[in-house]
Each structure stands twice: as structure tokens, then as C-alpha cells.
């Protein structure tokens, strides 16, 4: 019987999902992206060679693994084809391994222009988007005026839908934001070029997943961003435009929820956030700087510096609840190696009230003071450790405390960026 695992970020994204997905795809017939777009940045390091992926699933470097992009993903054709060409330049047959849902909404130049214009207009109140058109593309999907991959292969239908779409968005660009309009003919010609390139890679993703399961092959569902950026459950409005939680693996691919057997939450040993929004455990001192330097906390997609802070067990408990987490993968443990004392947030003091669960709304969270417990650090190297018993005693105690506070077992520990720098305590595919 096929066993299917969902991998999600359990914080504000950037938890190290790409490495873990690459590691686990050794056991799978296919890996599938189910939400987000090329605002994701998944970094893989294999035998010292780094590969950064934005749209293509992180299993693409594994021979014999099919990589699927589900209907929940918003697709920027230019970004996808650029990524394909980069992989082919490294000898990876990306076109052979990749299949794309015809129902994927397209990100077009008008979406990028709108995204950037809106963010600029917000000034100091900006959300911190990547400016890649993700939000406007999802808006068009929900409003039922979006253009999908399937539309590329019907010129007259494409031209009619594109004309209507640009009439709408150009009005806003010109008369509200005072920006230049997007040229219809230029976008149409680009889309027709994309059609020729994409056609061989388009397939019914739900049917492919069913065929893999019927053949007894395991599946891996790769989430992007993180739980606390979910459009419904995150720190709204400082969130992304898609559902980033495990439930989206079903709606974003066409698989039934009963076929999702194990949910692995990827979790840094500390906390980071990029862009705007509340961050109770943020450290704006030398420890925060140390975490950023040792963790190389710069976005793989935007290059922006990430904000760093202590581990937040309150937020993680909510992520565990929303996702029904089966296990945790703790990443970047080695970043904490030099610290004498480690702090874990176990509650928020908001005025006279102590919250031990995540308060509703970003506004309330911004006014909370974190309540901590302190644990001794280990001040010795964990970099590259591959066996649990080889970790320092205090490192093991720290991980066990996280298990206790969150109520979810630690299944995997990452001790470095390379695929092999990993401790596997519980293989999700053997536990599913």
C-alpha cells in the first residue's frame, strides 16, 4: 500500500523544507507542489553543490522521481522555464521529470506590476511581499477571471480572456497607481511561446497521483512558505495569498484527504521571519545578529535579511494543531552551538492576560511580551552529526524539551545544509 507524506513549514517559512524533501524523495515515486508560486526558495546542498529551486519540486535531482506541480500553484511560465534551463545546464533532465496541472493559474506581467505598485503605495505599512505577482494571480483565480495553463493552447480563447483581464488591470494601473499599462500584444505573443514550451509537460496531476498509488508508490507533498503565513490561519494581513497548511495538499492536487497519512512539520531550532508582521521572540541584539550570521539568514528568493529570535513553542503548538503534525523535523540545530543559554517562549503576556495559545489577529500579537524558560546550551559542535547519541547531552535535552512543549515527537534532526548531515529517528514513510 502506498504511503503518502505531507511536508509543511511550521513557522514563518524558510525552515529548510527543500533539504528535507530532497532527503525523503529517496523513498517516493513522485513529489508534488500544492500551493504558492515562485515566491518559494528551496535550497538543496548535495555533496557541496548548491541548487536553489523556486517552482520545481525539490525531488527533481533524484533519478526516477516524478515531479508534479498541482492546481493549487500559481505558475509564472517565464520563471519555470528559466529554472528548467538552469537544471538542464547542470545535466538534470527537468522536462522529462516534470508534469504540470492544466488548472494552474498563470502569473502574468500585469500581476507583477500590480504587486509592486500596491506595495510601493503602502509605504511604511507594506506587507513585505516578494513582488512576484503571487497575490494578484490568486485574486484573479478566486474572482474567476484568471487565465490557466489550459488556456494557452487555445489562441482565440486566450486572446479573449487576456483582453478582458488587461482591460481590468490596466485601468487600475493607470488611473489608481499612475503606472504604465501592460501591452496586450506583447503578453499574447509571450503566452503563445510559453504554450509550445509547456505543452509536453502538461498532465492531469490528480490522475497521475492515483496511478502512483495504485502501483504502490509512495508520494511526497511539498509545501511552501510556512503555517504562520497561511492566508486564513497566519498573522493576517502579514501573510501569503495561499493556504500553506497540510489540508491544502488535498485541494491543491486533487487527492483525497484520507490518502494523506503523515504530516511532517519542518521547524528551525530557533525562529525567523522575513518581511513585516509581529514576531514576539525577535532578538534585535548581538544574539539575533549571531543567529543570522551562523544561520546565513538571507532569503533564497529575495536575498532579504531575515529577522531572528528564540524558539516560540506557543506558535508551534498552534501549527501542530492546524496541521495535525505527526512528527517534527528540527533544522539548523548547529546554529545554536556557540550559545551559553537558550530560551524557549512558553507563553505571551498581553496586558493582564497570559496566553498559552496563539492570540487571534496580528494586532494583539504585536503587543504581547514573550514568557521564557531557559535551558543550558552545549557550546560544542553539532555540525554534520548523523547519530542521536553523538549529539551533546544538552542538545538532546533541548530537543526533548521541544517535544514535551509541543506534544509532537522529533522525527528528524538536521545538523547542516548537506543531504547527509541529518539524524533520522523516525522515517515518516515507515511510520505513515
UniProtKB/Swiss-Prot annotation:
CDD domains noted in UniProt: AdSS
Cofactors, names only: Mg(2+)
Main subcellular location: cytoplasm
Broad enzyme group: ligase
Pathway it works in: Purine metabolism; AMP biosynthesis via de novo pathway; AMP from IMP: step 1/2
Enzyme Commission designation: 6.3.4.4
SMART domains xref list: Adenylsucc_synt
Residues holding IMP: 14-17, 39-42, 130, 144, 225, 240, 304
Ligand binding (Mg(2+)): 14, 41
Reactions performed catalytically: IMP + L-aspartate + GTP = N(6)-(1,2-dicarboxyethyl)-AMP + GDP + phosphate + 2 H(+)
Active site annotation, chain numbering: 14 (proton acceptor), 42 (proton donor)
Sites where the protein binds substrate: 300-306
Compartment list: Cytoplasm
Annotated cofactor note: Binds 1 Mg(2+) ion per subunit.
Alphabetically ordered keywords of this record: Cytoplasm, GTP-binding, Ligase, Magnesium, Metal-binding, Nucleotide-binding, Purine biosynthesis
GO cellular component: cytoplasm
A single GO molecular function term of this UniProt record: adenylosuccinate synthase activity
InterPro entries per UniProt: Adenylosuccin_syn_GTP-bd, Adenylosuccin_syn_Lys_AS, Adenylosuccinate_synth_dom1, Adenylosuccinate_synth_dom2, Adenylosuccinate_synth_dom3, Adenylosuccinate_synthetase, P-loop_NTPase
Keyword Magnesium applies: yes
Binding site for GTP: 13-19, 41-43, 306, 332-334, 414-416
Homology family: Belongs to the adenylosuccinate synthetase family.
Self-association state and partner proteins as the record states: Homodimer.
Matches recorded under HAMAP family: Adenylosucc_synth
UniProt cross-references to NCBIfam families, sorted A to Z: PRK01117.1, purA
Function: Plays an important role in the de novo pathway of purine nucleotide biosynthesis. Catalyzes the first committed step in the biosynthesis of AMP from IMP.
Protein name per UniProt: Adenylosuccinate synthetase
Organism of provenance: Alkalilimnicola ehrlichii (strain ATCC BAA-1101 / DSM 17681 / MLHE-1)
Source organism phylogeny: Bacteria, Pseudomonadati, Pseudomonadota, Gammaproteobacteria, Chromatiales
Amino acid at each position: 500500500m502506498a504511503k503518502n507524506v505531507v511536508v509543511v513549514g511550521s513557522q514563518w517559512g524558510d525552515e529548510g523544507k527543500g533539504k528535507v524533501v530532497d532527503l525523503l524523495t529517496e523513498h517516493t515515486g513522485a513529489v508534488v507542489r500544492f500551493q504558492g508560486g515562485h515566491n518559494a526558495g528551496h535550497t538543496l546542498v548535495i555533496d557541496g553543490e548548491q541548487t536553489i529551486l523556486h517552482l520545481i519540486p525539490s525531488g527533481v535531482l533524484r533519478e526516477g522521481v516524478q515531479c508534479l506541480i498541482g492546481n493549487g500553484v500559481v505558475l509564472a511560465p517565464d520563471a519555470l522555464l528559466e529554472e528548467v534551463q538552469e537544471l538542464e545546464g547542470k545535466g538534470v533532465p527537468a522536462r522529462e521529470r516534470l508534469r504540470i496541472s492544466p488548472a494552474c493559474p498563470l502569473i502574468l506581467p500585469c500581476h507583477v506590476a500590480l504587486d509592486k505598485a500596491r506595495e510601493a503605495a503602502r509605504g511604511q505599512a507594506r506587507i513585505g511581499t516578494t513582488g512576484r505577482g503571487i497575490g494578484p494571480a490568486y485574486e484573479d483565480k478566486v474572482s474567476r477571471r484568471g487565465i490557466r495553463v489550459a488556456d494557452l493552447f487555445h489562441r482565440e480563447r486566450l486572446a479573449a480572456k487576456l483582453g478582458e483581464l488587461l482591460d481590468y488591470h490596466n485601468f487600475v494601473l493607470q488611473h489608481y497607481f499612475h503606472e504604465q499599462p501592460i501591452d496586450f500584444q506583447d503578453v499574447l505573443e509571450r503566452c503563445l511561446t510559453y504554450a509550445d514550451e509547456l505543452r509536453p509537460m502538461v498532465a492531469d496531476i490528480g490522475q497521475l497521483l492515483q496511478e502512483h498509488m495504485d502501483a504502490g508508490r509512495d508520494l511526497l507533498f511539498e509545501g511552501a512558505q510556512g503555517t504562520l503565513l497561511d492566508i486564513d490561519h497566519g498573522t493576517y494581513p502579514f501573510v501569503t495569498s495561499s493556504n500553506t497548511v497540510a489540508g491544502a495538499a488535498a485541494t491543491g492536487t486533487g487527492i483525497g484527504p484520507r490518502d494523506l497519512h503523515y504530516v511532517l512539520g519542518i521547524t528551525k531550532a530557533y525562529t525567523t521571519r522575513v518581511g513585516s508582521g509581529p514576531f514576539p521572540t525577535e532578538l534585535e541584539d548581538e544574539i539575533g545578529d549571531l543567529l543570522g550570521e551562523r544561520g546565513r539568514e538571507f532569503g533564497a528568493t529575495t536575498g532579504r535579511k531575515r529577522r531572528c529570535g528564540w524558539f516560540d513553542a506557543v506558535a508551534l503548538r498552534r501549527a501542530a494543531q492546524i496541521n495535525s503534525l505527526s512528527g517534527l523535523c528540527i533544522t539548523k540545530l548547529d546554529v545554536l552551538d556557540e550559545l551559553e543559554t537558550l530560551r524557549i517562549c512558553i507563553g505571551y503576556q498581553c496586558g493582564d492576560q497570559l496566553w498559552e495559545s496563539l492570540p487571534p489577529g496580528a494586532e494583539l500579537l504585536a503587543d504581547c511580551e514573550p514568557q521564557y524558560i531557559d535551558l543550558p546550551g552545549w557550546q560544542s559542535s553539532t555540525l554534520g552529526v548523523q547519530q542521536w547519541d553523538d549529539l551533546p547531552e544538552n542538545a538532546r535535552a533541548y530537543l526533548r524539551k521541544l517535544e514535551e512543549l509541543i506534544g509532537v515527537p522529533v522525527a528528524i534532526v538536521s545538523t547542516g545544509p548537506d543531504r547527509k548531515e541529518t539524524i533520522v529517528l523516525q522515517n515518516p514513510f515507515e511510520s505513515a
